[in-house]
């Protein structure tokens, strides 16, 4: 269960950071 959440966060957080800061 936890690895799935961690995997999703690993993909989600960078994309959110990219959208917010406009740095990809």
Swiss-Prot record:
Disulfide cross-links: 18-24
Protein family (similarity comment): Belongs to the frog skin active peptide (FSAP) family. Brevinin subfamily.
Function comment: Antimicrobial peptide with activity against Gram-negative and Gram-positive bacteria (MIC=13 uM against E.coli, MIC=3 uM against S.aureus) and fungi (MIC=6 uM against C.albicans). Shows hemolytic activity on human erythrocytes (HC(50)=7 uM).
Native organism: Lithobates septentrionalis (Mink frog)
InterPro entries named in the record: Antimicrobial_frog_1
One protein family per Pfam: Antimicrobial_1
Predominant subcellular localization, coarse grouping: secreted
GO (cellular component) term, any one: extracellular region
Protein name: Brevinin-1SPa
This protein's UniProt keywords: Amphibian defense peptide, Antibiotic, Antimicrobial, Cytolysis, Disulfide bond, Fungicide, Hemolysis, Secreted
Cellular compartment(s): Secreted
Tissue expression notes: Expressed by the skin glands.
GO biological process: defense response to bacterium; defense response to fungus; killing of cells of another organism
């Amino acid at each position: 269960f936890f690895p799935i959440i961690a995997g999703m966060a690993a993909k989600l957080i960078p994309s959110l950071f990219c959208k917010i800061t406009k740095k990809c």
